[in-house]
Amino acid sequence: MALNLQDKQAIVAEVSEVAKGALSAVVADSRGVTVDKMTELRKAGREAGVYMRVVRNTLLRRVVEGTQFECLKDTFVGPTLIAYSMEHPGAAARLFKDFAKANAKFEVKAAAFEGELIPAAQIDRLATLPTYEEALARLMSTMKEAAAGKLVRTLAAVRDAKEAA
């Protein structure tokens, strides 16, 4: 489909605005995936706070120029689906990783987080980041365990002191 200059500028402006507020980005190749499966992926992405769009590679290069996602430029080859995580850095990576397990033709190319290129083989680094709620839960359980351990040690010391007396 041929795009005129105004359409291209509108696409670059829209995706650039999203990229400015994004925490991470993941690039994938969706050749061979059925429309129904892609619709499911897009729906899951909206629910997870992930912005997804298929954009021409030349336009994507303009979008990422001067941003933390510039390291992805070399991955813009062939049909490119880009996903930006808006709420949690690992959301898009987790979504694409799970989708790739169920769809063999879906290929994750790379990801970017804080200006660092993460190859597809290491996408788990980003996908396994805990969500904010999970991190809080882990912190609270650690704090709770530490307090309980301290209480047990204090009671044991009091018991030992009474036995010695």
UniProtKB/Swiss-Prot annotation:
InterPro entries: Ribosomal_uL10 (IPR001790), Ribosomal_uL10-like_sf (IPR043141), Ribosomal_uL10_bac (IPR022973), Ribosomal_uL10_bac_type (IPR047865), Ribosomal_uL10_CS_bac (IPR002363). It comes from the Bacteria. GO terms for cellular component: large ribosomal subunit. GO terms for molecular function: large ribosomal subunit rRNA binding; structural constituent of ribosome. One of its GO terms (biological process) is translation. Keywords: Ribonucleoprotein, Ribosomal protein, RNA-binding, rRNA-binding. HAMAP family: Ribosomal_uL10 (MF_00362). Part of the ribosomal stalk of the 50S ribosomal subunit. The N-terminus interacts with L11 and the large rRNA to form the base of the stalk. The C-terminus forms an elongated spine to which L12 dimers bind in a sequential fashion forming a multimeric L10(L12)X complex. Belongs to the universal ribosomal protein uL10 family. Forms part of the ribosomal stalk, playing a central role in the interaction of the ribosome with GTP-bound translation factors. PANTHER family: 39S RIBOSOMAL PROTEIN L10, MITOCHONDRIAL (PTHR11560). This is Large ribosomal subunit protein uL10. It comes from Pectobacterium atrosepticum (strain SCRI 1043 / ATCC BAA-672).
